[in-house]
Each structure stands twice: as structure tokens, then as C-alpha cells.
Amino acid sequence: MPRYAVLGATGNTGRAIVQVLLDRGSCQVHAYCRSREKLLRLCPAAADAECDRKRLSVFQGRLDDNRIIDDCLRGADAVFLVVAIVDNMPGCTVAIQAAHAVVASLRRLQTATPGMHLPRLVMLSSASLEPSFCGDVPAAVHWVLKTAVSHLYKDLEGAEAFLRAQDDWLSATFVKPGGLVHDHAFGHQVCLDRAQTPLSFLDLAAGMVEVADNVDGRYHMRSVSVIPTAQGTRFPWDGVYYTMTGLLFHFLPWTYRFLGDYPLPPPERAKTD
């Protein structure tokens, strides 16, 4: 039975991945989060499965808790790195922290068990960081979108660069979707050359699971996207709000303290899902 580790299980993408995996059945899910109660409250599928440890195990703690992360990753066939925040927090480093925590944990586990099977890593990023995925987006619009999420994109770029530097012993894939929205699953396709907005979190999750299940190496250290295969996904109107506030936090980062969704972190740490 395959085992999947989800880092950031209380976030929008993390919850969707947990739901997709549990709905599919015949697998074990290790869900890492800062708050077990939040996960069970926001993800009914997790609440239903939590009593059956053969299906779901929840690991609550901090990313720098080596024991928690090691236990979460031990025996995993794939690891989803979807630790994230939703707005343009200055100084955000949650993606970098997660990448370093996973790599350090796998090194510890490999030292303890030489020759162990290493999981495939699937990291959530953004189509805005892959120019070839945004060929149909006007340059001015692309600039606005990148600027409105500048702090988060700097974090994602750092995490991706770090994971790519591990390509001599780890396999990672960087999933870069377009604009995301809470909606039903409409069907998905993993795509190598373009992104599409809007895309539901459930369709994104299904695509990320498909990438994680691939064993022939076609996605090794590649950037991919996920696109819907049917019409009807609603437009992510909340993205307009986050674009406006994101521009504010880019040009006037001090305003985040008063208008941001999260407490500002110390310089070396940011709050995670």
C-alpha cells in the first residue's frame, strides 16, 4: 500500500490532497500540520479517517522538530511540499524552511537505514515563475501578478533552487498552476507547456497525486502544470483582493503588520499552515 506524506495539510492545497488521497483509498496518508484540530475541522475526510491509523496519521508540530518530520516522512513513497501562506508576507520563508526540513530529514533517515527507498518530492509553486507557462498572459498583467506575490515568489524560487541542487540523490517535480479557486473537481490534465486559470484546488490535488504516482522518471526535476479538462470552474474573485493587498505589501511592506493575514515572523522564521 503506497504511503504519502503531506507537509502543509491544513492549507488549501494540502487539504485537497488529503481529501483526494482518502477518497481514492488503498493508501496511507501522513499529514503534517501545526494544528491537528484545524485539519480535522476543515477537512471532513480527515476527520472521518483519523480514527483508522491505517489510512491517516496526523503529525502535529513545528518544521524544526526533527522527530516529528522524520516520523512523518518515514516509509513515504512521495512527499508533497505544500506548506504555504495565502498573502504577500514580507520575509516569508516557509517554502524554504519546508524544503530544508525535508532534505535534512531524508538524510537522517538514509543514514539510519542505508539503501532505503527515497520518496519522490512534489513541490507546489506557481505558473508565474515559469515564463513558458504564461505565454498568453499580457506582459503588464504578468508584471502585476508577480509583483503582488513578490515575497512569496522569492521564497518559492529559493526552495526550488535548493531542491534542484539535490538532483544527484533526490527526485523532485515543481507543480506550477495558474489561479486557484475553491470549487468542484472538473477533471484535470498534467501539462508540460502551459497553465490555465481558473483551476480548482481539487483538480490541482488530483494532478499532483498523478505526478507523485509516476515512476518512469518523466517528471524528474521538471516544472509541470495542471489544467482543467472541462469548463465551469468559477473565477477566483478573492484573487483580486489579494492582488491589491499584495501590491501594497510589495511597495509598502510595513503595512503588512496592520493588514496582513498572519503575524509578521522574526527575520528567520515565518508562520506555516
What are the residue ranges of the model-derived segments?
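N-terminal Rossmann NAD(P)H-binding glycine-rich loop of SDR-like oxidoreductase domains
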Residues: 2-27
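SDR active-site strand-loop-helix element
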Residues: 7, 32, 82-83, 121-127, ...
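Non-catalytic, hydrophobic alpha-helical segments
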Residues: 13, 159, 204-208
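Conserved glycine-rich Rossmann-like NAD(P)H-binding loop of the short-chain dehydrogenase/reductase
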Residues: 25-39
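NAD(P)H-binding glycine-rich loop region in Rossmannoid oxidoreductase-like domains
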Residues: 36-37, 41-101
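Conserved Rossmann-fold NAD(P)-dependent oxidoreductase catalytic core, especially the SDR/UDP-sugar
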Residues: 90, 101-150
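Conserved beta-loop-beta element that borders a ligand/cofactor-binding pocket
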Residues: 160-183
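Mid/C-terminal beta-alpha module of Rossmann-like enzyme folds, strongest
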Residues: 194-273
